[in-house]
Amino acid sequence: RHYLRRDAREAMRGTKTGPLTSALEVLRDMRDPIRQLVERGLLSQDQYLDFFLRWFNSLNDFLSIGPPALRIDQLQALLGAGIITILPPGMQIKGIDGQFLLKTPSDPSFSVQAKSLLEARVPAVNAPTAQNALIQQLLHDGYAHTYELQLNADKRFQSGAIAVDRQTQQLLDANEHPQPGLFFWGVPTEGVHWLTTASPRPLVNDTSLKTAEQIVQTIWEV
C-alpha cells in the first residue's frame, strides 16, 4: 500500500512538476524512434524476441503505461476496507471439492479458497486462438497467416500476430504475397508492429494517424 500511495502521489504531480513522472515521460517520447527500430528490422530475429518482446516490452509497460491516479486511489480504498487482497507472486490454482484453492510457493503459509474464479488478465495477441470469425476464416482460407520469427539454430517462433506488409499494411497470404484491398492494422498485428494499443498523442505526428492516412492513400492508388 505504501507503493500505491507513492505511485498516486507522483502521478498527481504530473509530467511538468513531478521529477519521476517527467523522467518516465521520456519513454513515451521515445516511442516513435523505437517503432522505427522495429519497423526497419534493425534487430536480429533473436534480439527482437529475447531482448525486445520478452524483456524491454514488459519493462516499458510497467514504467510508462498504467491506470489513472484515481484508479490507484480506489484500489487503496478497497485494500484498506479488506475487500481486495493482493496475492503473493507465483500464484497456483487447483480445483478441490468444487472450489478453487489458491496457493503460492513464495509464501507456504498463504492459502485462499473461493467458489468463483474470474480470469481478468488481458490475453496476449494470438490469431490462431482468436474468437473473431473473420480472422479464423482468413487463416483457414489461406488469405492470412501468422508472423513467424526465424531464430538461430533453425528454430522458429510463432508470434501470434497477423502478418502484414510493414510498409503498406496489406495482408500477407499464406505464400507471403501482399493482397490488394485487404489491410490489417492495430491489435491483431501486435508483434509485427509495436504498441498498437497506444492512443494518439497531441501535438506530434502520431504513428497511428499517419498509418491510417497511408492506408487510405494506398486504397485510392489501387
Feature roles, as predicted:
Residues 1-220:
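Flavin (primarily FAD) cofactor-binding/catalytic cores of flavoenzymes
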